């Protein structure tokens, strides 16, 4: 890996971050707050939240088996995606490399930040080659994006190829593990010390059932996290989100129950879906969704919309012609989908 200073945009490295009132307050006991020009009358949301989300990070750390200083919390994982561009990529100069197809926000954030986005197609099994990704890089490649389990394909990427990339690439490797709670594959969180160029994304939106509160997690070395903290907005995670996340962390046993139930439903739904006349193939999945190749994705999608059932038509993206992405719902929801498709005339 190149020196972190060399990878970071010079203006970001030299940046003196904005210091909010609560940044300067070290968390000692206090009962009178006259530092932030807040309304003193309790609503009870009159006070700014902890800008560093200390309570939340201290609860996440033992669950994820990491140091709190290696955690960044953002307004959804999309904030962390945007931050890696703003921190490390010089607009109009640097580039990033990503597998294709994958999560669309990697490219959206590249376009917003005027960074060249280079795609490397997966093979017919939706796997990637580290050598092919490396061949797409040059001296101005700052980031490589991987998503495992991948969205929209659903499968885990080959760990050996991921490790080879981490060992070889001189920039930063982002591994998005948004769906890892549904997979038996070990997380890369345990390898943060081994790979200083590794950034891992996770989220509260999937297994934790908290998509509405918009809370994403990034894990990396303390040095990388400190750069994120320099350039994030002062109060990027609001108090209501922090409170809801703390409450969910106290109920983490429910997440395990939800995941078990969803995996059982995934098996049932896939086994029945593959028998439908309109289904040509279901690709292997390690997530809470599956990708199905069907006879006519657009026609079936519109048919389901007419029945009040929404799936995702992925036919317009690479390697997904006539494919629908189907999220695993509750048993009654899944039964409604199956019943509708059994009545569909191919």
From Swiss-Prot:
GO terms for biological process: L-histidine biosynthetic process. Its cofactor is pyridoxal 5'-phosphate. Pathway: Amino-acid biosynthesis; L-histidine biosynthesis; L-histidine from 5-phospho-alpha-D-ribose 1-diphosphate: step 7/9. GO terms for molecular function: histidinol-phosphate transaminase activity; pyridoxal phosphate binding. It catalyses: L-histidinol phosphate + 2-oxoglutarate = 3-(imidazol-4-yl)-2-oxopropyl phosphate + L-glutamate. Its EC number is 2.6.1.9. It holds the Pfam family Aminotran_1_2. The modification N6-(pyridoxal phosphate)lysine is found at residue 206. Keywords: Amino-acid biosynthesis, Aminotransferase, Histidine biosynthesis, Pyridoxal phosphate, Transferase. It is an enzyme of class 2 (transferase). Homodimer. HAMAP family: HisC_aminotrans_2. Belongs to the class-II pyridoxal-phosphate-dependent aminotransferase family. Histidinol-phosphate aminotransferase subfamily. This is Histidinol-phosphate aminotransferase. The lineage of its organism: Bacteria, Pseudomonadati, Bacteroidota, Bacteroidia, Bacteroidales.
